[in-house]
Amino acid sequence: MTNPKFFRMALVLGLLSAIGPFAIDMYLPALPAIGVALHTDTHAVQMSLMAFFVSFAISQIVYGPASDIFGRKPPLYAGIALFVIGSIGCALAPDIVWLIAFRFLQGLGGGAPIVVPRAIVRDLHTGAEATQLMAMLMLVFSVSPILAPLIGSLIIDAAGWRAIFWVVSAIGVIGLVLVAFTLEETRPAAQRAQSDVASTLRAFALLLRDPHFIGLTAIGAFGMAAFFIYLANSSFVLIEHYGLTPRQYSLAFAVNAASFIGVSQFAGKLAERYGLPRIVSVALLGFAASMVVLATLNFAGIDGLAPMIAVLLIGFGFLGLVVPTTSVMALDDHGEIAGAASALMGTLQLVLGALVIAVMGVFVDGTARPMVAGIAVVAVIAWVLSRWTLGSRPRETAPA
């Protein structure tokens, strides 16, 4: 697990996986400015984020099985090319309707570089090794939440919000170059020959009948829904409610993202020592407890920026252990249909995230309360689901 090829693969897959998140995170500091420039309200601007998540989810149900049938690289070419076209459209959008439409197109392409790398991880490794590679991949692509908002705020200051989408377009082109010159095909021709549309439908049916897969996917979905709530609301809360500048907001966002990333890097080592189920159980308990504490403080009138950042730092650290471990556990039993499994998992998680963003938009009131309450609710749901899912399957013992 320490050879150069392992690290090189993590770097390439991480950079590809970062393409979609960059399209989300880089424009977060610009959300209030976009609303002003396009003469629209907060909820309408949030719909541009929801549109991306919806199409991002839909596309995964296509790219995952396609990567089983045609190999891992062709869907990457098609998806990233579509992503670049959508990004250019966003840069040229004359109003909020066109921005939402091109964000939808951007998301349709952006699904490929997020779902295919997960399938490649399963092609190459299982268990603790897969967890280690998934965590390293997350380290690379999760640099996006740290750097992208800061880069976005600098671009806004220098050239305005539209320039953000020109930069994102260039990132997509770089992704095409990476696929062409640095990525090897990991889906053998013999396995591709065994895959077709009918087998994909059978694979989906098999996965939907697997309560362990569905349970783990749901845990990850509600865990990520907490982060989606933060993505959709944090710029308005921190900039408009707490009075931060876009650059200050990007730094505050980076602090919490760094916690998520940093802790995730211990997932592989902890899995080797304690086993995946125990890691998920403890991490979800800590995540839910910290988010409930945050909501309680806020509703008790302790509405300070420092307490919020501090508690989110702790909570997102726990979440950093949940995401890679639940992904690996969900895919471990389905290596022969890893593309379909990865696609279905990603689709279900993102659809839930989009629905949560839409619902949360109704409760926006200019304060932090809807955001912290929403995060606490989905965190508790994730913890409850873990009690059912992990309790319905024989406990995995830690390696000796």
Q: Would you name each region that the model predicts?
A:
Residues 1-2, 186-217:
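Juxtamembrane intracellular "pre-TM" segments in multi-pass secondary transporters
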Residues 37-39, 71, 92-98, 109, ...:
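Helix-breaking motifs and short loop linkers at transmembrane-helix boundaries and internal kinks
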Residues 58-97:
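Conserved MFS/SLC helix-loop-helix module at the cytosolic interface between two early adjacent transmembrane helices
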Residues 60-71, 263-276:
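Helix-to-loop junctions at the C-terminal end of transmembrane segments
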Residues 82, 86-89, 97-105, 306-312:
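Paired small-residue
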Residues 98, 136-181:
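Helix-loop-helix hairpin linking two adjacent transmembrane segments in secondary transporters
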Residues 102-143:
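Cytoplasmic helix-loop-helix junction between adjacent transmembrane helices
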Residues 328-366, 375:
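A late C-terminal transmembrane helix in Major Facilitator Superfamily
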